[in-house]
């Protein structure tokens, strides 16, 4: 009798398992309230009964039914054309005996938002004007897919979350930078905006990079950070669970706010993130825009000036990886002892101004910081030339804060620098080359140089200057 009972239960379990397997399933990134990238062919995928033909019907394009066949492994994928921004719509996947229908689907712009604590930082954690911003966060055209903090040793195919409409309750728990970025875009583009938020405080870039890329690269493998007890540090562990399940969801681009946890291995940072971006672009199928925030002034108490070297690496990436851009936020720092600048609205909106200009062709506000172009010795003076989309420099203090001149002996020289258009001119009375000119090239100095639009100058350190 006992054996018969076990046999019946086993057959029921097997039957139930077969039925579950036969059901049409979608990953959680496809759920009610989602945003699909407008004017493109978006990938839609999931699981089902092997060899079954599925039909995908979109309410925005009712005359075009997309068909696909489930493969022998029970997986399927199809490309579904989208049109102009709008909604709400339905999206349905139908099989012979089962179907899945999604509602409140919007067509608009989709951005991946990733990084460490400054990207993760929410209104609940404390932001400028937080209570007021939360109260005003009812924004139905902004949709949030907040990926829970979880790692995995191997690439995963799904994560446990769902799309949510931006409300005071959902906004206060997600990335403030990402939310303000999305809100600015939807206000200016007049289209729905969806944000895929995958961020975890304290994490180095290695965890967001496929493990084999780090381990097989001699430089990256040698320079990877040692184990740390408080947050993930193993290469690939967050890529596997917080990026890979989103692949190949169609995105317009990515914003990235990370770097603080990599200052100790700063010299290889540009190499690391360049390879990470390359891997992500391969996964998502195109060279999407990758925009990021240069780490802000902060009193790390680090050795060997590593935070300055990290910022230098972040700027170096601009010349190494195509379709990238960076914003500087040193002017938004209120307390250099706090590694988390609290004016997340200004940071998110500065990133949005960058995207509005570069991606959507609409200039809505300043975002670009001047960069060092060259420095040379001319008849008893050093001329530092800056480049960028600005007309003239100005200083918010009588003497330029953060500007340092050293001579061939390593002595710091006190000089009164002058500003002339895009140039900084430093008189040199006693010639003792080679000279170096640096600006905010340390941990925490907030410089006084600004453009006429108020944008801060990027930190820099010149090469030795000795020829006239």
Predicted regions and their residues:
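Bacterial Sec-dependent N-terminal signal peptides
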Residues: 1-25
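Cell-envelope and extracellular/periplasmic
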Residues: 23-468
């Amino acid at each position: 009798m006992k054996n018969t009972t076990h046999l019946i239960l086993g057959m029921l379990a097997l039957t139930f398992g077969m039925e579950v397997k036969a059901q049409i399933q979608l990953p959680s990134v496809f759920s009610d309230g989602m945003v699909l990238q407008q004017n493109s062919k978006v990938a839609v995928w999931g699981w089902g009964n092997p060899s079954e033909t599925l039909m995908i019907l979109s309410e925005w394009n009712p005359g075009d039914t997309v068909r696909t066949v489930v493969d022998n492994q029970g997986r399927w994928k199809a490309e579904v054309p989208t049109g102009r921004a709008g909604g709400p719509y339905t999206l349905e996947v139908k099989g012979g005996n089962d179907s899945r229908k999604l509602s409140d689907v919007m067509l608009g712009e989709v951005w991946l938002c990733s990084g460490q604590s400054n990207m993760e930082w929410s209104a609940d954690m404390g932001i400028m004007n937080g209570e007021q911003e939360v109260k005003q966060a009812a924004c139905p055209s902004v949709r949030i897919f907040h990926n829970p903090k979880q790692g995995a040793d191997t690439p995963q195919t799904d994560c446990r979350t769902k799309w949510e409409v931006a409300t005071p309750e959902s906004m206060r728990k997600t990335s403030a930078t990402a939310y303000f970025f999305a809100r600015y875009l939807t206000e200016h583009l007049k289209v729905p905006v969806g944000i895929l938020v995958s961020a975890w405080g304290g994490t180095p870039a290695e965890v967001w990079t496929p493990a084999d890329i780090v381990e097989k690269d001699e430089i990256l493998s040698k320079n990877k950070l040692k184990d740390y007890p408080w947050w993930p540090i193993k290469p690939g562990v967050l890529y596997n669970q917080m990026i890979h399940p989103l692949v190949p969801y169609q995105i317009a681009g990515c914003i990235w706010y990370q770097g603080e946890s990599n200052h100790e291995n700063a010299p290889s940072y540009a190499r690391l993130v360049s390879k990470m971006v390359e891997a992500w672009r391969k996964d998502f199928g195109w060279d999407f825009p990758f925009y990021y925030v240069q780490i802000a002034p902060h009193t790390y108490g680090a050795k060997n000036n590593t935070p300055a070297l990290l910022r230098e690496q972040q700027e170096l990436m601009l010349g190494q990886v195509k379709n990238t851009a960076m914003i500087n936020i040193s002017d938004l720092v209120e307390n250099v002892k706090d590694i988390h600048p609290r004016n997340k609205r200004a940071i998110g909106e500065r990133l949005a101004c960058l995207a509005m200009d570069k991606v959507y062709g609409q200039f809505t506000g300043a975002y670009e910081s001047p960069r060092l172009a060259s420095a040379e010795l001319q008849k008893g003076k050093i001329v530092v030339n800056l480049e960028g989309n600005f007309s003239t420099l100005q200083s918010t203090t009588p003497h330029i804060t953060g500007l340092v001149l050293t001579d061939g002996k390593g002595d710091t020289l006190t000089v009164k620098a002058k500003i002339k258009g895009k140039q900084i001119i430093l008189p040199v009375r006693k010639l003792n080359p080679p000279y170096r000119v640096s600006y905010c090239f340390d941990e925490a100095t907030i410089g006084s140089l600004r453009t006429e639009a108020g944008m801060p100058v990027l930190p820099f350190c010149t090469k030795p200057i000795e020829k006239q």
